[in-house]
Amino acid sequence: MISLIEKAPYIPYPLALYEKLEQRHTLLFESAEIESKAHTKSLLMAKACLKLVCNHNIVTITSLTPNGGAFLQTLSAFFKTPIQDNALTLTYTKDKKIQDEFLKLFEPSPFDALRGLFKSVKTRPKHPFTLFSAGVFSFEMLNFFEDLPHLKANDNTANDFIFYVAQNLIIIDHKEKSAEILGACFDERFKTEIAKELQDLKELVKNIKSDFIPKKAKQSIEVSVSCDDSEFEKKVLFLQEEIKKGEIFQAVLSRSFYMECLEGLSAYYHLKLSNPSPYMFYIKDSDFILFGASPESALKYNALTNTAEIYPIAGTRLRGKDKQGNIDYDLDSKMEFDLQHDYKERAEHIMLVDLARNDMARVSKKRYCDKLLKVDKYSNVMHLVSRVVGELKKGCDSLHAYRSFMNAGTLSGAPKISAIKLIYQLENQRRGSYGGSVGYLNSEGSMDSCITIRSCFVKNNRAVIQAGAGIVLDSVPQNEANETRAKVQALIDAIRKTIS
């Protein structure tokens, strides 16, 4: 593999740049600091050369460009599998004889297809993003590893995972005010062509002088919901009975809100403007659009330090606002104090921090928790947060850590598998991207991902916005229903701002 790197002028308008490049199999990842809300970094996949799709135990790898076809040939040799119809099809079977929880992490799985991307090629020159793969893990990715029922499809039709390999990647560092463009070349024959693509991108960057201008469209403002408050509250009561029986301690029950969405990119613009978050993303597939502003890290792994971290978020309050909808700082401080000293919220949060520590223990030599019970604030809500860090055991990589963590206790419950079985019973349909993760893997071996919450899945101009609430014995059913509405409000507002 040959890596091409071009320095480019700094551009403070990543969304305006993405608008010029928006097509199928592209994505934009952005990040903002929680405290200052200042933007820190943007990653823009301008062109993908491969697409990987997982459906339960089958992974299909398809080339999207001639250069991707060359990489597919390399992968064919690596996996010892022939190419048919411009694609590789890999099938994985669980080894049910393995009982040891640590050894189970190393059984064959669809994650091996992602590992193969990086094991099959040697990168030169060395750059952390020489080879870059990014995409989505669904909530139901867990079903391959655990004995869980298969559910009917939801409007959120995201596969178990969908990942792309970048042919052209633009990296913008907003702190350093720098930019670079990377090209991944898998055959000498395509070097000149990819070098030209990088020069064209460089010219495009130079010519963008102003920010993205959002568009509007005529569409309905109506919002519908998968289950109304009354039905949701009955499900809360059912879970509380299961808690009394000792089946679970906590479960995260969710519901979906639906509305029309004709201008996804403009809705994303309004969302990130009102709700700058550590993880902001816009993904355009051939089948759907997924965008969001997630406050919660799924798994962050630094290959250089061999450390993984999880950022549990559990415990929510509305922001303190006046009648005009502006932040009332005295009221906001009272809400923050109330959240930090609420026995129910603290107990729920500590339980999920303990679950995160247990997940980390499976793959780490040592671990610790810092930032315990800190408060992060967003446009409509504030959350209790903590950070769990661990140094991975020998032989473990980012995907072993993700497997151990999947799915986040803050989106499932405790004990995790028992809670998920009850969630499946009550929700009775796939969550798809909701509660899974969005993230990337790079050639350094590092991974960064967020839990797919505060997100919107759009297919055929229909938006699915899903949100959940953590149910414990002390939960007040109406309050939990209200919490789901509070969590989706920023997305509903963002879409409504695109309506003419």
From Swiss-Prot:
Keywords assigned by UniProt, alphabetized: Amino-acid biosynthesis, Aromatic amino acid biosynthesis, Lyase, Magnesium, Metal-binding, Tryptophan biosynthesis
Co-factor binding details: Binds 1 Mg(2+) ion per subunit.
Record EC number: 4.1.3.27
Activity regulation, free text: Feedback inhibited by tryptophan.
Pathway: Amino-acid biosynthesis; L-tryptophan biosynthesis; L-tryptophan from chorismate: step 1/5
Reactions performed catalytically: chorismate + L-glutamine = anthranilate + pyruvate + L-glutamate + H(+)
GO molecular function, one term: metal ion binding
SUPFAM superfamilies the UniProt entry points to: ADC synthase (SSF56322)
Chain residues that bind L-tryptophan: S31, P278, Y279, M280
Residues annotated to bind Mg(2+): E348, E483
Keyword Ribonucleoprotein: no
Entry similarity comment: Belongs to the anthranilate synthase component I family.
Quaternary data: Heterotetramer consisting of two non-identical subunits: a beta subunit (TrpG) and a large alpha subunit (TrpE).
Name of the protein in its database record: Anthranilate synthase component 1
Organism of origin: Helicobacter pylori (strain J99 / ATCC 700824)
